[in-house]
């Protein structure tokens, strides 16, 4: 029979999770935030931070890894019969992880972490490329450009939109979905029809 984790171990795990959440939130708005700022946001001491992370770069790599794990899981588990619905649903679910998206994107602006970010997000990028190819081949997505280029435009547009701090209204997820659908060739009327016919696009997980 496995013994339960002792209180100190549980506290250490809770502190680590608190630090990662705080780092994600702080770095989403301030990519140059210090360890002191992150520790303060987590309600912990600087010493507690160093007890889990050797330095600021180590913590930033952990933030990238934690975010990528969620993003890649979303990519792998979002699969509808209509590629337009799949893309819209994926955009909705990623928007709900906007803080993690912004933190990872901000960290990636630092060349020292660009390679880490690219590698961590490779599964998500591959999923978008495969989905785009399916959408183009089926006629669901625009066919006036190579699928590889369209996938790149989807990725870059989604990243820019998800990082937009001014999207704070209750229907911000709808805005994100409409922006992405417009990139793949849907008119605003077609977007409205698709959203109306597929309420699952905005369903909670």
Model segments located where?
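Alpha-helical DNA-contacting segments of helix-turn-helix folds
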Residues: 53, 57-67
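Amphipathic alpha-helical packing segments from all-alpha helical-bundle domains
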Residues: 89, 112-163
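C-terminal peripheral helix-coil segments that are non-catalytic and often amphipathic
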Residues: 2-3, 130-138, 163, 167-205
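Hydrophobic alpha-helical connector segments
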Residues: 62, 73-101, 113-115
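Short hydrophobic/aromatic patch on the recognition helix
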Residues: 43-53
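Basic, helix-initiating cap at the start of DNA-binding domains
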Residues: 1-41, 58-61
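Short linear capping/connector segments at secondary-structure termini
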Residues: 106-115, 196-197
């Amino acid at each position: 029979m496995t013994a339960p984790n002792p209180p100190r171990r549980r506290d250490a795990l809770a502190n680590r999770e608190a630090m990662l959440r705080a780092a994600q939130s702080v770095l989403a708005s301030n990519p140059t935030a210090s360890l002191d700022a992150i520790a303060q946001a987590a309600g912990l001491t600087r010493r507690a931070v160093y007890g889990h992370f050797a330095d600021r770069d180590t913590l930033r790599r952990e933030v990238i890894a934690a975010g990528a794990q969620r993003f890649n899981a979303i990519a792998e588990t979002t699969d509808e019969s209509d590629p337009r619905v799949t893309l819209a649903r994926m955009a909705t679910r990623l928007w709900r992880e906007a803080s993690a998206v912004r933190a990872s994107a901000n960290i990636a602006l630092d060349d020292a972490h660009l390679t880490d970010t690219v590698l961590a997000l490779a599964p998500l990028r591959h999923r978008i490329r495969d989905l785009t190819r399916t959408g183009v081949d089926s006629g669901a997505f625009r066919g006036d450009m190579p699928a590889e280029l369209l996938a790149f435009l989807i990725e870059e547009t989604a990243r820019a939109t998800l990082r937009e701090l001014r999207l704070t209204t209750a229907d911000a997820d709808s805005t994100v979905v409409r922006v992405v659908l417009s990139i793949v060739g849907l008119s605003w009327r077609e977007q409205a029809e698709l959203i109306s016919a597929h309420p699952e696009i905005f369903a909670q997980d």
